[in-house]
Amino acid sequence: INLLKEENIFVIDNSRANAQDIRPLKIVVLNLMPLKITTETDLIRLLSNSPLQIEVSFMKLKSHTSKNTPIEHMKAFYRDFASMREERFDGMIITGAPVEHLEFEDVNYWSEITEIFDWTRTHVTSTMYICWAAQAGLYYHYGIPKYQLDKKMFGIFEHHVTEGFSHLPIFRGFDDVFYVPHSRHTEVRREDIDKCKELQVVSESDESGVHIVMARGGREIFVTGHSEYSPYTLDGEYRRDLGKGLPIDMPKNYYRNDDPEQGPLVRWRSTANLLFSNWLNYYVYQETPYDINQIR
């Protein structure tokens, strides 16, 4: 709690929460990122910027052990899917994972995560899949393949809402042009998605491609970018890869005057807040039943 307050994240205590005459929204995060505490903070910062009460739980996989997060932290804040499968949640976020170089079926937790993908359809009102999870969800649910890129998609890219979809609540308050961080070696392609009548590409970029894909009236939202990234996340990835001697270009449109010493120019923060607050309000809060056990 103190860490969240130090990050200027709005938190209320139980007594104040209980005095408010609303049911908290139950949100579960399946956190597959290596630096779990960083990802938790990034997501909670966005989820907390809402007048709604949010109760966040963290899920972990039984078939995968985190190497970069203290075991004490995992025991204190994370639960296995098996212990949560009888519960229902208003919303779920499934994060990216550093396994995109593998075929989906070769990921060591593929069996468990696809069981979770199936579970979301009967136990969660709306699920947001991010980056690798978006590709994995599109592949598992709809057969959409991923493709290896010649060069890593790395930087901040200009996006727009696809023609005909500006009325969607997910885009309320968005500018005509908005910016999103990307950090990935693979992509899904518009031509494959367009062949599936259940899917809609609702935002995209001329440079980085497909951005948001929606299905089932917003019960499934697939996001290829990382709007949740904090200002220095791409900087950390860039310097990490440089330190390892890996081939990596400087992130595009990221540093002031393309100079790493001048730090990043943040152009995606307002869009990130709108994306998550619109999702929480219009696709979770407005759609979920008051009796959470009625979620089907």
In which residue ranges do the predicted regions lie?
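Amide-donor transfer/coupling interface in amidating biosynthetic enzymes
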Residues: 1-63, 78, 82-84, 88, ...
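Short, glycine/acidic-enriched capping/hinge loops at junctions between secondary-structure elements
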Residues: 39-42, 68-71, 104-105
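N-terminal beta-loop-helix "entrance" segment that forms/cooperates
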Residues: 62-75
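Helical hinge/lid and interdomain linker segments adjacent to catalytic or ligand-binding clefts
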Residues: 74, 78-81, 104
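Short, Asp-centered acidic motifs that coordinate Mg2+ and/or phosphate
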Residues: 91
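Cysteine-nucleophile active-site neighborhood
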Residues: 94-165
